[in-house]
Amino acid sequence: ICAAIAAARHGSSVALIHSRPVLGGNSSSEIRVWTRGATGGGNLFAEEMGILGELKLANQYRNPEGNPILWDAILLDAVLMEPNITLYLNTFVSQVEASEGHIKTIQALEIISERKLTFSSTLFVDATGDGFVAASCGMEYIIGKEDSSTHQEANASIEFDPTTQGCTILMNTVKKDHIVPFIAPVFAYSLEHIERLLNNGGRIVCEKSNGCDFWWVEFGGQQDTINSIASIAFELKKLIFGIYNYIKNSGKFDAGNLDLSWVGSLPGKRESRRFKTEYMLTGNDVIAGKTFDDVAFYGGWYLDFHPSEGIYSKTDFCTQIPVSLYGIPLRCLYSSQFDNILLCGRILGATHVAFASTRIMDTCALSGQAAGTAAWFLVSQGKKTKALAEASVYRKIQSILEEDDMLLPGHFPTDSGEEITFIPSSVITSLPGKELGLLALDQDFFLALPVSLAKVSSLILDSEQKTDLQLEVSYSMLPSRNSYSKDKESFRKSLGQGRTTLSLMPFCKGEGYLLLVVKQHTGISVAICDQALSGVVCGYTASATYYNPLLDIDSFAGFGAQNLNNGYTRPYGGANIWLSSQEEVPSIKIVLPKKRKVSSLTFFFDCNLSEEMVSSRVQDVDPHHNIYLRYGVSPTLVRDFEIFAHIDGKEVLLRQVKDNFQRHVDVLVGPVATDLLFVRFLSTFGAKNTGVFEIRVH
């Protein structure tokens, strides 16, 4: 979806061919796996944006309950709104005609109509999950786990292992107001069989288990997840119905009123082919956060390993190693030996170890936008895939991706070259809210904020007695609560009794973001605030529930209008946001160096990039997911605003935007000739201060 939309928006004519009746792959209502990514891995301010961000924000606004059927509709809406996309659902690609590294045509069957279709194109993007198109044209691939000597990966198998991660079928249940009997189908596994599988390695059920709680009902990793998928699906059906029968009829659960509302028919597949591309991302790259000149998107989910035996394993159902945000190069999406095909999704060029992180859906979606943008650029310039290795080509693609709200770790934006002056009506001068309460340090606590802000800030604490605090400090461009730098420095600080402040200035020896970890200490609490200060967050290192620290701040100069054209559209090395005071109608005056034609303005608003926006949800989420499910639109997002221009001595209204729910907003206003624009921000979704990362004038 993201590849098709990216290419279409930039001007390509796109045929989107999908074998299923609904869009969304593993996140669709057919399979119902929720979308997760870098934020779910503990990275802060790291929620994936771009086209995926648009889809997620639309889902938060229109589908706050996380109904997977409505998620399907949001995806379909997004595709159908693009005039350059022709959508082919229920269409299975059956044959690829290719020679000498060039695809000529692909043949497909529209299953419900029996139409045989032939597609010819200048360029193809394979987002099939199994890589059918790429494999059919002869691109080399790997199935299984490389040995540790191949890429010197510490987490790799000692010897080559042909097994993979398995597949899963989920189920949904509902609670009724009456007893609902259940007689298991004959094919379901017996209560005895299921009991032998449960309660090992975290495989625990209860009457509240629902939806993605059953992700560990996994099978097929020791089989061929492509050619044996039908038998794998049947085994999973036997398991999932057997597990439901166990919950209902074993007598161990209060499940009399429980009713089965849905069971998947199509397995959610984790792994099959991985292709050998121009560069193979390794686990070492992921752990080190290696920088790439041709970085095109990013990941940040754990190195998340599942035993290939799946539910039949006696070991833990997964092993998750936290990683910080890492970039992924464009070279992972193509092989120069094939001149007109790009890859995206879980088939991209990565070792099995790196794949344990890159396979997650949010990362796959970002790879789609990168591939779609690159595809359009190559076609528009009459170039082949090998041109993507040229600096002049990938730098242009990078600038386009950044314009389209894609974060490229390690790539720093260039100056636009135009001297535009932004004059705000106000700048924040005090914390947005008031004290909410205290957060006890009964486990390790973290505070993340820009070093520039930390230099003028103190953390407010309460201590029952005089004591010493154990602290750890690290620095990064974008922090993670559970994967902080190996170069961390340890401190010991004395604390007085009662309400006290801890100056952060002594810890500011690095640049970018400061991550301060206060080790568990009974009798000490941190004061928290009821309103967010953009670019600042705190919480427990082991929890995805975050808080707003109550800070004593000497200066808010870092939240001025200088951020509106510094090139950064989210927290990265700093807060990078203008925050108004709590005035009724904050505004920005935009002064151009000379009168010129203005056609549009682009805004990047604050939607709270530290809280996950998943595609679907259930009412009760098992704590082992370690996820905070936000409801609806972030209070910090700008909702209503107006744009004016100074024309012939008068202030003229160009556009009113009402009920905006997007972060990246392009507003057409012209063309109009002017050298002075005004933007008035009429309301947010609840925040008292208006926040804007970037404004661009086109």
PLM regions with names:
Residues I1:
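Beta1/beta-strand and adjacent pyrophosphate-binding region of the FAD-binding site
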Residues G11, S121-T122, T674:
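Short, well-ordered alpha-helix to beta-strand connector turns
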Residues C529-Y547:
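Short beta-strand elements
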Residues E511-L515, L676-F678:
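Short, conserved beta-strand segments of beta-strand-rich sandwich/propeller modules, principally
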Residues N26, H102-T105, I112-L453, K466-G498, ...:
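Flavin (FAD/FMN)-binding glycine-rich loop and adjacent Rossmann-like elements that form
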Residues D444-S483, G523-L533, T569-L653, D659-H698:
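Aromatic, loop-rich ligand-recognition surfaces of beta-strand-rich domains
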Residues A6, S12-S13, I17-H102, I142, ...:
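Conserved N-terminal/central alpha/beta ligand/cofactor-binding core
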Residues A542-S581:
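Compositionally biased low-complexity segments at domain edges in trafficked proteins
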